[in-house]
Amino acid sequence: MAFDPASLTFDANGLIPAVAQDHATGEVLMMAWMNAEAVARTLETGRVTYWSRSRQAFWVKGETSGHVQRLIELRIDCDRDCLLLLIEQEGPACHTNRRSCFYTALREGEERIVLDPMV
């Protein structure tokens, strides 16, 4: 069955959440937003493109940092309102220079940093 981007469910701002996961390890790396054009650009180029809500502009992951995300597979959830991007990540995914943006764990009511910045 051919993919129809119009079948995705975008929010009132025309956005859909996209979770990036390392295709080899299963590690969840980050969550960002995509609009229909970002999805199309990602599928066309193989380089993950998000929509920056703060800058109101396209954001090709790694364009300035060199920490590129290459799309291996795009998955769509059952409600078609969330995307899972199985990717190959070069370097850290997080702007804090950590492998994952999910570096803070809540353990016994306390926040704990569980990932150090990459060197």
Swiss-Prot record:
It catalyses: 1-(5-phospho-beta-D-ribosyl)-5'-AMP + H2O = 1-(5-phospho-beta-D-ribosyl)-5-[(5-phospho-beta-D-ribosylamino)methylideneamino]imidazole-4-carboxamide. InterPro entries: PRA-CH, PRib_AMP_CycHydrolase_dom, PRib_AMP_CycHydrolase_sf. Mg(2+) binds at residues 77, 79, 81. Zn(2+) binds at residues 78, 94, 101. GO terms for molecular function: magnesium ion binding; phosphoribosyl-AMP cyclohydrolase activity; zinc ion binding. The keyword Metal-binding applies. Binds 1 Mg(2+) ion per subunit. GO terms for cellular component: cytoplasm. Keywords: Amino-acid biosynthesis, Cytoplasm, Histidine biosynthesis, Hydrolase, Magnesium, Metal-binding, Zinc. Belongs to the PRA-CH family. This is Phosphoribosyl-AMP cyclohydrolase. It comes from Cereibacter sphaeroides (strain KD131 / KCTC 12085) (Rhodobacter sphaeroides). The gene is hisI.
